[in-house]
Amino acid sequence: MDSYGDTSGRIGRDWLDRHDEELEQELLDDELNLDELFGPEQEDAPGELSRRRYFRELFRLQRELVKLQNWVVHTGHKVVILFEGRDAAGKGGVIKRITQRLNPRVCRVAALPAPNDREQTQWYFQRYVSHLPAGGEIVLFDRSWYNRAGVERVMGFCNDEQYEEFFRSVPEFEKMLARSGIQLLKYWFSISDAEQHLRFLSRIHDPLKQWKLSPMDLESRRRWEAYTKAKETMLERTHIPEAPWWVVQADDKKRARLNCIHHLLQQMPYREVPQPPVHLPERLRHADYVRHPTPGEIIVPEVY
């Protein structure tokens, strides 16, 4: 069991991570801005990832993601990336950093709810198909058709025949996607028992995060070992050349984000596409233009 000092340190890092999440949107992508915030650059201690280095690497990788986006649009490439892992493993965090500076018309997130009564009667993969990309699009699945191999298996939401049929079907389904020109990447975010315990406690005691905890999440915690067995079976039976699994060590949230983004960029045959210069046109002005005052009753009160 972790000592009080270890737990206290982890809680502190979790708080700092939430603070840095706000900074990510506010900081400019330049070294001067980082100098003002963190002071002159110093060498990281062995095994440590400084906040300054994290921001620098995140911004660098996000610049590459913009290049990837431009290349996808230019070439009509189609990309699907699946993010799987236990509850609180950090899937949403890396998805947020990937999409943070991208065009939502090009890169979108698919996070499907539990199937409704009608969807439960469909071909299992049917409800996912409508979310697949057209040319020039990237789709990030925050959980995916692998729910059947994980939560549905562990919680008893599918029977043995449905479970086995999934394993018979999913390799062919993913090979079909590959033949259609879709590049498919599959990531499993791996966290330890102790780390999930800490992250759940953080959510329980943070009013801004309690919404992230569902009764299903709490039950999944109790069934940790069953999830381990389900995960191992899934990776073994669905790791195929056309769509291999990649495991992200995710106990350290920031390292996991950087490692995952760096890896997915390496899997893409993208290049920088020259962009035409953008010129701001002069505003047209007409002699008879009048801007009428806005009625006071529809103006939002300036409380702040």
Curated annotation (Swiss-Prot):
A biological process term (GO) from this entry = GTP biosynthetic process
Q: Which cysteines link up through disulfide bonds? A: none
The UniProt entry's coiled-coil ranges are none
User: Reaction catalysed by this chain?
Assistant: [phosphate](n) + ATP = [phosphate](n+1) + ADP
Transmembrane segments annotated in the record for this chain: none
Give the signal sequence positions. Answer: none
State the source organism's domain of life.
Bacteria
Show the GO MF annotations: polyphosphate kinase activity
Ordered alphabetically, the record's keywords are: ATP synthesis, Kinase, Transferase
Q: What class of enzyme is it?
A: transferase
This entry's Enzyme Commission designation comes to 2.7.4.-
Q: What task does this protein carry out?
A: Uses inorganic polyphosphate (polyP) as a donor to convert ADP to ATP.
Family per record? Belongs to the polyphosphate kinase 2 (PPK2) family. Class I subfamily.
Q: Which NCBIfam families match?
A: PPK2_P_aer
Specify the protein name: ADP-polyphosphate phosphotransferase
Q: Identify the species of origin.
A: Pseudomonas aeruginosa (strain ATCC 15692 / DSM 22644 / CIP 104116 / JCM 14847 / LMG 12228 / 1C / PRS 101 / PAO1)
